[in-house]
Amino acid sequence: PPRRQLRPPPPPPPPPPLLRTPAAPPPPRAAPAGLAEWARLWSGVTDVDDLVPGLREGMDRRSTRYLLWRDGGEVLGCAAVVTCAAGASLEHIVTRADHRGEGIGTALTRYALALALAAGARRVVLTASPDGEGIYRRLGFDTVGHVERYA
């Protein structure tokens, strides 16, 4: 199915993240040891040794922040915020299949958007699958184009 390019609403005040447990908010950025966990959830594969160096490169340049949603040590969601002079992109927002519908994707998106705005982004974009489009619409994003295929 085609993916949709979405445009964000005007910047809201940064909302607090929704928490599954008050003591466990998503960290602002995955620790280097957490990159493998992030890559496993995002990619859906267990052997992520080839992916981690590329992820670490964005982290080292400070252009990318990786977010993990944990509950009791289990990774249930992930997202990334990529910033540049032109703005920011919210990417790879994934909730583990057995925890979809619990608000994790919404909370990660809100948190990622708040980070992008706090970094000075005046324009924030994301690409949504048909399954996630409703979440982003409820958060005020608009469709501005369609992506037929990623390469």
What are the roles of these predicted feature ranges?
Residues P1-A33, A128, Y150-A151:
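Acyl-donor-binding surface of acyltransferase catalytic domains
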Residues P1-R3, T106, A118, P130-V147:
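Conserved active-site alpha-helix within GNAT-family acetyltransferase domains
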Residues D50-R96:
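A conserved beta-strand-loop-helix scaffold within acyl/acetyltransferase catalytic domains
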Residues A116-A128:
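Conserved GNAT acetyl-CoA-binding A-motif
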Residues A31-W42:
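A short, well-structured alpha-helix characteristic of acyl/acetyltransferase catalytic modules
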